Structure formats: C-alpha cells, structure tokens
Amino acid sequence: MMLRVLVGAVLPAMLLAAPPPINKLALFPDKSAWCEAKNITQIVGHSGCEAKSIQNRACLGQCFSYSVPNTFPQSTESLVHCDSCMPAQSMWEIVTLECPGHEEVPRVDKLVEKILHCSCQACGKEPSHEGLSVYVQGEDGPGSQPGTHPHPHPHPHPGGQTPEPEDPPGAPHTEEEGAED
C-alpha cells in the first residue's frame, strides 16, 4: 500500500520535471553547450534620482535547442527541447539611490539581483528562488545583518523569501526626522 502511494506521488513529479540540460548533440559531436557568468557594470536608476553604477554579472552562452518535425496523426511524442543560459545562483542586494531636490522622498531603495553562477537550463523554467542562497546586502556591506537596512522605510525586506523578479520592491520611502544615517 505504501509503495503505491509513493509511486503515485513521486512518478508524476518525475515526469513533469524539466529534462536535464544537453551538453552534446549527435548531429554536432564537435560542439558543446557553454554558459558562464560574465562581469558587467550595471547602471541602477530611478526617475528623479541619481543613477549608481554597480558591478554585477550577466549570463552569456550557447545552450542547445532542437525541434524534430512532427507527424499527424502523431505516432510518438513531439521531440522538442530548449535550454537557455540563465542564472543558477543569485542573491539580492539593496542599492540606495539619492534623490536630490525631493524632500518628501530623499532616497529610493532598489533590490538588484546579483548573479553568482549561470548554467544551461530548460527555457520555460521559471527562475527558482527555492534553495538559493538568499542574502540581502545593504549599504553597510557584507558585514551588515541580512534583511536590515540603515534607513527606516515602509516596505519589508525579503528576510527568507526572494521577491518575484516581475515586481521587485523598490518603492520610495520617506526619511523620518531624527533618523540616523
């Protein structure tokens, strides 16, 4: 009975899991997939604020994809595969931008994804933030406490959760009187 439950729960998960990346193709035995993190200078900006240049990495490479012609009626599964060079490990860093001339909003915090490692992964795969080493680094540098920030503001920091890439928090905040810098 327990074996049926285990097979019933694990087998569908294994079938739905993305296939492993392909490093070689039989048609091109002399070519290999490659994917690496390249150093870049990224400019972080916000309307009405001074932009900052930071060091980051971008994923660059050539991963395999292929599509074998189908038949109708279909006699076998469609043979389509797609890998893309994308972040395999990243962390989030707070970048504070100064907004001179804006008394109500003197600073804006931006969360920036810092790429640590890249690899060939399934194209349709959503960026997985589960199991990633998430550490928010503030202005005080690596010695500062994860999830803390030297300026008080209304938006929460991602203590153990990573914000969704589509909508990272970057809302402006108001400096309180008497707050320490």
Curated annotation (Swiss-Prot):
GO terms for molecular function: BMP binding; identical protein binding; morphogen activity; receptor ligand activity. It is found in: Secreted. Its main location: secreted. Residues 132-181 are annotated as: Disordered. Residues 1-16 form the signal peptide. Residues 35-124 form the CTCK domain. Keywords: Disulfide bond, Secreted, Signal, Tumor suppressor. GO terms for biological process: determination of dorsal identity; negative regulation of BMP signaling pathway; negative regulation of monocyte chemotaxis; nervous system development; neuron projection morphogenesis; positive regulation of neuron differentiation; sequestering of BMP from receptor via BMP binding; sequestering of BMP in extracellular matrix. Most abundant in normal lung and meningioma. Disulfide bonds join 35-85, 49-99, 59-118, 63-120, 82-123. GO terms for cellular component: extracellular space. It comes from the Eukaryota. Belongs to the DAN family. Possible candidate as a tumor suppressor gene of neuroblastoma. May play an important role in preventing cells from entering the final stage (G1/S) of the transformation process. Homodimer. This is Neuroblastoma suppressor of tumorigenicity 1. It comes from Homo sapiens.
